[in-house]
A protein has these predicted regions:
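Short, surface-exposed beta-strand/loop "edge" segments at domain boundaries and coil↔beta transitions
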Residues: 44-45, 123-127, 149-153
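Conserved protein kinase catalytic domain
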Residues: 2, 9, 62, 111, ...
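A generic structural signal for secondary-structure junctions
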Residues: 13, 115, 122, 169-170
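Non-catalytic surface loops within mature trypsin-like serine protease
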Residues: 31, 121, 147-149
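ABC transporter nucleotide-binding domain
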Residues: 62-145
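C-terminal coupling/interaction segments
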Residues: 132-175
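ABC transporter nucleotide-binding domains
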Residues: 3-84, 88-97
Length: 175
């Protein structure tokens, strides 16, 4: 195991002569991942694994995690508030808010299933479909809707996972 850990530390560019207390936050996270991977796990459980990292270090850590999951026998269960990391790493996304599971679905299916509708507040009020979240401003309105519920020809925009989460929460999901 120690040989594998040393090999991973070299691969991750971690200095072997530096003490842990002198490592940056990103280096500490890489070391934690190296130690975890040294045990040849099939499943990694990660809580806010990229929290507090600068964008470059966050990208390096998510790349390491992606390499791990390229083996179909490996999985990661990750909790994070950094939605871009979830979009990069996850095949399936579960969204919890105030202890309630709002959704749990494959990431690509979520993008295909939901869309953003844009129009005026009056058009939104007249919309005859279930709205999963909405935002009304002096400049217009947007609504999170299911693509298949909208009339043919309705102009819809793709929704990011972050927009989906924000509209479900701020837009009073399932009012």
């Amino acid at each position: 195991m120690y040989k594998r850990q040393a090999e991973l530390c070299r691969k991750f560019g971690l200095p072997d002569k530096k003490q842990y207390k002198d490592y940056s936050t990103g280096m500490k996270m890489k070391l934690c991942i190296a130690v975890a991977l040294a045990h040849h796990p099939k499943l990694l459980l990660l809580d806010e694994a990229t929290n507090g990292l600068d964008p470059v270090m966050r990208d390096e850590v998510t790349d390491l995690l992606l390499d791990f999951t390229r083996d179909e026998n490996h999985s990661i269960l990750i909790s994070s508030h950094i939605v871009s990391d979830l979009e990069k790493l996850c095949d399936t996304i579960a969204f919890l808010h105030k202890g309630r599971l709002l959704l749990c679905e494959e990431k690509d299916a979520l993008r295909e299933e939901y869309a953003l509708w844009h129009g005026t507040a009056a058009q939104l009020a007249a919309l005859d479909v279930r709205v999963y979240g909405k935002r009304v401003t002096p400049y217009g309105a947007e609504a999170l809707v299911r693509r298949d519920a909208m009339p043919a020809g309705a102009e819809l925009a793709p929704v990011s996972i972050e927009e989906l989460f924000v509209l479900m929460v701020k837009g009073e999901c399932a009012e």
